[in-house]
Amino acid sequence: MLNCNYYNEIKNELINNEIYKRVKDYSKNRNELSVYYNVGKLLSEAGKHYGEGIIKEYSRKLTIEIGSGYGISNLKRMRQFYLIVEKGVALPHQLSWSHILAILPINNINEINYYISISIEQNLPYRQLREK
């Protein structure tokens, strides 16, 4: 009987830890996606006023001031992410940026929504989503 109590306490601790990790990750994902959406929106608006070359200029400056990770292709992906959301794709916070990158090449909104739903329903890791 005593053995069972220890087990339950250990199990509860581990379950609570798993829940915390997921909440923490979802919070992190939500923030990251929100930031990338906002950056994409600003890039889209800046592009209308200053032309496509603005992404190259911003990329150069951001890389100098903040560091790597803000290359031209990444900034273009952020803009593409914003444009997809604006077309009506609802992106749940469970998806990581890697998941988003896997669906960005898809042009059909229904296909995008399909892959988002199977990603969540089947809890697909990024690599498995990319294979589909």
Locate predicted features.
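Basic, low-complexity intrinsically disordered segments
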Residues: M1-K132
